[in-house]
Amino acid sequence: MVKVGIIGGGGYTAGELIRLLINHPNVNIIFVHSYSNARNKIIDIHTGLIGEMDLIFSDSYDLNEIDVLFLCSAHGDSKKFIETHTIHTELKIIDLSIDFRHKENAGGFVYGLPELNKEIIRKAQYIANPGCFATAVQLALLPLAKKNLLRSEIHINAITGSTGAGVRPTASSHFSWRNNNISVYKAFTHQHLKEITESLNYEPSRFNFIPVRGNFSRGIFATVYTESNLDIKDAVQIYSNYYEDSAFTFISDKNPDLKQVINTNKCILHLEKHGNKLFIISIIDNLLKGASGQAVQNFNLICGLNEKTGLFLKANAF
């Protein structure tokens, strides 16, 4: 069994991570640490886990007791944690924050998008788990980027559920504002753009990214279009070839809906050609393929396990 610890255990991503790990056949959770919830029962915060576990949030931890550490703290806190703790030489770390995703700040962390870096991830000790928007958009465009077929402006509209804003309610995330409502935020400036442009190796000024707050809890529905000389048959073949060995990214010949991926680690892509424009739909669960599910996928890879272990999940399709 692989002994794991979690830092920052009170949020949505940590709650989903705990849910996945307690059902993972190769995992023993040693501690879940949370400053704000220390000594409370985990099921009192993550109420969906009632009957599944009896652990409490710890107020202390020993990194020498674990093999893998998941960092689920706020952006900025992971870097501070690494700087202020002695990390034993065998400890593997998977960070779910933004702190080590960019190349200039990586500090030995490998960018953990398996569809891009799977073989590098297998050999890595430290993983920077990608952002949710970044995951959806990169998976929509990677096959084109790797064939050097991105040659014009890219237009992206992506709508996300309220859980993407975190567990603490804000003026734009609590129910009475979010329900029956929709709004644009961080147009052209979203922090995930840098991840996207670095991985795709494409000029940042050619991305037109409009993130949208949706009136639902979870999931990302991204639409992407760009000019392309490919006909639809060739485009679908390029995508099918690229994702042929992917454990979780699939091409659908039918226009997908968000419920097909909610509660799963899947990304479903759909392609259409309209005149000279290639149109791509990319859908994921922001808390799973966009966060905790992808973290477990990376955990499996760095631990030499089957990539899909613990991630056979049923979609909320009905």
From Swiss-Prot:
It comes from the Bacteria. GO terms for biological process: L-arginine biosynthetic process. Pathway: Amino-acid biosynthesis; L-arginine biosynthesis; N(2)-acetyl-L-ornithine from L-glutamate: step 3/4. SMART domains: Semialdhyde_dh. Its EC number is 1.2.1.38. Transmembrane segments: none annotated. Keywords: Amino-acid biosynthesis, Arginine biosynthesis, Cytoplasm, NADP, Oxidoreductase. GO terms for molecular function: N-acetyl-gamma-glutamyl-phosphate reductase activity; NAD binding; NADP+ binding. It is found in: Cytoplasm. One of its GO terms (cellular component) is cytoplasm. The active site is at C132. It catalyses: N-acetyl-L-glutamate 5-semialdehyde + phosphate + NADP(+) = N-acetyl-L-glutamyl 5-phosphate + NADPH + H(+). Catalyzes the NADPH-dependent reduction of N-acetyl-5-glutamyl phosphate to yield N-acetyl-L-glutamate 5-semialdehyde. NCBIfam families: argC (TIGR01850). Belongs to the NAGSA dehydrogenase family. Type 1 subfamily. This is N-acetyl-gamma-glutamyl-phosphate reductase. The gene is argC.
